[in-house]
Structures are given as structure tokens and as C-alpha cells.
A protein has these predicted regions:
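Active-site pre-lysine segment of PLP-dependent enzymes
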Residues: 119, 124, 140-159, 163-197
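Conserved PLP-binding catalytic core of the aspartate aminotransferase-like
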Residues: 250, 263-295
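Short loop-beta-helix segment that forms the pyridoxal 5′-phosphate
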Residues: 48, 60-82, 95
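PLP-dependent enzyme catalytic core of the Aspartate aminotransferase-like
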Residues: 145, 293-294, 306-338
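N-terminal "arm"/small-domain region of PLP-dependent enzymes with the aminotransferase-like
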Residues: 1-46
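Short, conserved charged micro-motifs
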Residues: 31, 126, 283-289, 321-325
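PLP-dependent aminotransferase class I/II
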Residues: 29-32, 184-262, 266-269
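PLP-dependent aminotransferase-like
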Residues: 85-145
């Protein structure tokens, strides 16, 4: 696992006043989620379902599929490792920059990895390919036609589409409609980001029954805990009322981006999501530490994304008050110390 994911609050003894380092929805109805968890708290005294069967049934119903087309995971990340295990030793294409756990999973299972820059991206023959749509860390959106072209052009290659952030990008089209036409497609969903439950760990995978069977052989029993199963079912049934208002969120993000444009030494990278990269003349690891120590503000140092360097960091869009807090802090930091 890469040392340096976002939301690394646990590493700091400093009080965090504003956490820009994670792409999780910042304004979720945590009181409602807490009440659902409390309702089911006694389930912790019993073993959960071995393969989260009732959650899988609800996922299948939600997506108009069969349970045989679904695997539940202890977060989306577990699913990436299951796929890498099932395709152990494969030739695998990884666009960069992107989420590090694709690479980490492939490294663990001895894949021959081919890193292809996202800029002017061209696919090629391989056994497996991972894409993140919209992409983390830069908010790039893959058009549905691009995804379908890859599936058509390389029918022997399994394409994994990670849609963990799709609720934050109105221009991104879900590709589950392609599942019926392409047996070489896997779609990953995370419950973590849109509903702000990263500590519960819950995600799921959709795909052709034969492909799902190949991967299911590597799953472990009881990989999803009892509380995650219950809140997952609740969110699939009622979650549309809890999703981010992306229209308002992205308007605030555009204001945030414009403010960065006016800051000397900071250049925001175009993004179609609420989070975005910023290129800076400063060193991001130092900037991160200064913001944390002096202002209690946490950003995501993006220097450890393959394809980026120490002059990139990532921020999520938060409330107007917290966005202004970061901008004021950057104006106050002495440039000579960065």
C-alpha cells in the first residue's frame, strides 16, 4: 500500500480545522447515518452473512442485474486486489496519474505493468486495464464512447472501470449499460465517497457471470461487516436523497478554482469534479506540513502519484467558509519558507 493517501488525520496530533485532503462528501447527513447504525448495533454480537448476501441481492435489484453479477467488497480497494489476484501475472495497462492501489495490487500479484500517460491516452493489447472515471486525482472524465471503443477494440482484455467518484461528476456517464454487451467489462462502485462512510468500508463489483465467478474464487468469508451490510442496504433504497447537490457543489468549486487562479504561484488543473489538482511553484510536502502546523489545514500532497511531482497537491471543495480559510492561509504563508 502506498504511504501517503489522503485523510491521514491519524498521523497528526494537530487539531484539523479543515480537511481538504479527502474526496469524500463533506456535508453528509451523519446524524441519519448514525441513527441507522444504532438501530442495528446488536448485529455486532453475531457473525455477518458470509458473502454479504442480502446486500448483494439489493445491489442486483438496484442495478437490474442478478446476484451472480455482483461481488461485495470491504471497500472498493479490496475489489481491486481481488481482481489483481484473479489475473495474477497478467499484462496490465495503468493510465497515470491515477489511484495508486491499482498499481499496488498489480505489484503484489506480479503483473507486467504498462504505465500510459492520460494525456493523449492510447490503449493497447493487454490482459487487463484499470481506469478511474472520473479520475482521481485530476477529475478527468472518460466519455462513454471512449470506454466502449476500448471494449470493442480489445475484446480479449478485461477493462475495470472504477466509478467511485461518479456522483461528483455530472458529465460522467455510468457504464453499467454496457455490461449486457461486453463480457470483458467490470464496474466498481464505492459507497464510501458519496455517503461519507469511509470507516465502514463498503463497495461492490458488477460484471459478466463468468468473469465474476473467476474473481469470486479469491474472496474471503465475512469480508463485509454486519453494520456495513445494513447501512449499504439502506443507502441503496434511500440514498438518492442523501447524495451531494452537485450543481451547487460544482458552482462553489468553480469559484474556488478562480480564487486559486488569482493566487501567485498556484495554477489549478481543469477538473470535472469537486476535487482538483493544483500545480505550485512550491514544494507540496513542505506546503502540506506548514498548512497543518500553522493553520490546522490538511491538503493532499500529490507528489507520490505516479506521473506527478513534488509541485502538485490536491484539494476537495468544502464549504465557502473553509475554502476561504485555505485561501487566506496560502496568502499568509511566507513564500521564502516553501
Amino acid at each position: 500500500m502506498l504511504n501517503g493517501h489522503g485523510d491521514d488525520i491519524y498521523k497528526s496530533s494537530t487539531e484539523i480545522k479543515a480537511n481538504f485532503s479527502t474526496n469524500v462528501w463533506y456535508d453528509a447527513d451523519t446524524d441519519l447515518l448514525r441513527s441507522i447504525l444504532t438501530t442495528h448495533i446488536d448485529k455486532i454480537f453475531h457473525y455477518p452473512e458470509p458473502a454479504a448476501e442480502s446486500f448483494v441481492q439489493e445491489v442486483a435489484r438496484h442495478h437490474n442485474l442478478q446476484p451472480q453479477n455482483v461481488i461485495a467488497g470491504n471497500g472498493a480497494t479490496e475489489l481491486f486486489y481481488l481482481i489483481a489476484h484473479a489475473f495474477e501475472g497478467s499484462k496490465t495497462i495503468l493510465p497515470i496519474p491515477s489511484f495508486s492501489e491499482y498499481e499496488d495490487a498489480c505489484t503484489l500479484y506480479k503483473h507486467q505493468q504498462i504505465f500510459v500517460p492520460l494525456k493523449n491516452f492510447q490503449a493497447g493489447p493487454a490482459d487487463l486495464m484499470f481506469i478511474c472515471n472520473p479520475n482521481n486525482p485530476d477529475g478527468h472524465v472518460w466519455q462513454l464512447e471512449e470506454i466502449e471503443n476500448i471494449l470493442q477494440q480489445y475484446p480479449q482484455m478485461t477493462l475495470v472501470v472504477d466509478e467511485s467518484f461518479i456522483d461528483f461528476a455530472p458529465t460522467a456517464q455510468p457504464c453499467e449499460s454496457l455490461l449486457v454487451h461486453y463480457p470483458n467489462l467490470l464496474v466498481i462502485h464505492s459507497m464510501t465517497k458519496s455517503y461519507a462512510i469511509p470507516g465502514l468500508r463498503l463497495g461492490y463489483m458488477l460484471g459478466n457471470e463468468d468473469l465474476i465467478d473467476r474473481i469470486r474464487r479469491f474472496t474471503h468469508p465475512w469480508n463485509v461487516n454486519a453494520l456495513a451490510i445494513e447501512i449499504g442496504k439502506f443507502l441503496l433504497q434511500n440514498g438518492k436523497y442523501l447524495l451531494p447537490d452537485t450543481g451547487r457543489l460544482l458552482k462553489r468549486k468553480e469559484n474556488f478554482v478562480r480564487a486559486f487562479d488569482e493566487l501567485p504561484g498556484y495554477t489549478p488543473v481543469p477538473s470535472e469534479t469537486s476535487f482538483f489538482l493544483i500545480h505550485t511553484i512550491h514544494k507540496s510536502p513542505v506546503l502540506k506540513q506548514k498548512l497543518l502546523e500553522q493553520f490546522g489545514i490538511l491538503i493532499r500532497d500529490a507528489s507520490n502519484f505516479r506521473g506527478l511531482d513534488e509541485h502538485y497537491f490536491r484539494v476537495n471543495t468544502l464549504s465557502e467558509e473553509k475554502n476561504q480559510m485555505l485561501l487566506r492561509a496560502l496568502r499568509l504563508l511566507p513564500i521564502t519558507n516553501l
